[in-house]
């Protein structure tokens, strides 16, 4: 790799999850692309990479994000948060939210699951990770 790409890679390694999420959104807007398909591949690859590390402690690496309930007044905000977390269309996300308690996403890496939980809870939903 070139020195420039090495420098960019090192800068990316220092980003927090929130900063990385903001960067992805900015890249999507700037270049008119969607990271939804590639994000799923990264999420699915991460647990395998962590398991291959040979860690002695058995820490759960994949989680199911479960929408338990939501404040009726915050339904639209919760719907938007679920759409953002899952990449679903409006009708599919609405059906998912209205079926609560229901899994929003299954087999998600720990960090991504915690981010989804935080976003949905900030919107007014009650979420558990299993």
UniProtKB/Swiss-Prot annotation:
<protein>
    <recommendedName>
        <fullName>Large ribosomal subunit protein bL12</fullName>
    </recommendedName>
</protein>
<dbReference type="Pfam" id="PF00542">
    <property type="entry name" value="Ribosomal_L12"/>
</dbReference>
<dbReference type="InterPro" id="IPR008932">
    <property type="entry name" value="Ribosomal_bL12_oligo"/>
</dbReference>
<keyword id="KW-0689">Ribosomal protein</keyword>
<dbReference type="Pfam" id="PF16320">
    <property type="entry name" value="Ribosomal_L12_N"/>
</dbReference>
<keyword id="KW-0687">Ribonucleoprotein</keyword>
<comment type="subunit">
    <text>Homodimer. Part of the ribosomal stalk of the 50S ribosomal subunit. Forms a multimeric L10(L12)X complex, where L10 forms an elongated spine to which 2 to 4 L12 dimers bind in a sequential fashion. Binds GTP-bound translation factors.</text>
</comment>
<dbReference type="InterPro" id="IPR014719">
    <property type="entry name" value="Ribosomal_bL12_C/ClpS-like"/>
</dbReference>
<dbReference type="GO" id="GO:0022625">
    <property type="term" value="C:cytosolic large ribosomal subunit"/>
</dbReference>
<comment type="function">
    <text>Forms part of the ribosomal stalk which helps the ribosome interact with GTP-bound translation factors. Is thus essential for accurate translation.</text>
</comment>
<dbReference type="GO" id="GO:0003735">
    <property type="term" value="F:structural constituent of ribosome"/>
</dbReference>
<dbReference type="GO" id="GO:0006412">
    <property type="term" value="P:translation"/>
</dbReference>
<dbReference type="InterPro" id="IPR036235">
    <property type="entry name" value="Ribosomal_bL12_oligo_N_sf"/>
</dbReference>
<comment type="similarity">
    <text>Belongs to the bacterial ribosomal protein bL12 family.</text>
</comment>
<dbReference type="GO" id="GO:0003729">
    <property type="term" value="F:mRNA binding"/>
</dbReference>
<dbReference type="InterPro" id="IPR000206">
    <property type="entry name" value="Ribosomal_bL12"/>
</dbReference>
<dbReference type="InterPro" id="IPR013823">
    <property type="entry name" value="Ribosomal_bL12_C"/>
</dbReference>
């Amino acid at each position: 790799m070139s020195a420039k790409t090495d420098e960019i890679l090192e800068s990316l390694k220092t980003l927090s999850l929130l900063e990385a999420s903001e960067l992805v959104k900015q890249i999507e807007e700037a270049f008119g692309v969607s990271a939804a398909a590639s994000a799923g591949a990264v999420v699915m690859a991460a647990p395998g990479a962590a398991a291959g590390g040979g860690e002695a402690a058995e820490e759960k690496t994949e989680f199911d994000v479960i929408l338990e309930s939501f404040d009726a007044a915050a339904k639209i905000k919760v719907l938007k948060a679920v759409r953002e977390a899952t990449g679903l269309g409006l009708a599919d996300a609405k059906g998912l939210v209205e079926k609560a308690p229901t899994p929003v996403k299954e087999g998600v890496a720990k960090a991504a699951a915690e981010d989804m939980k935080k976003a949905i809870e900030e919107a007014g939903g009650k979420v558990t990770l299993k």
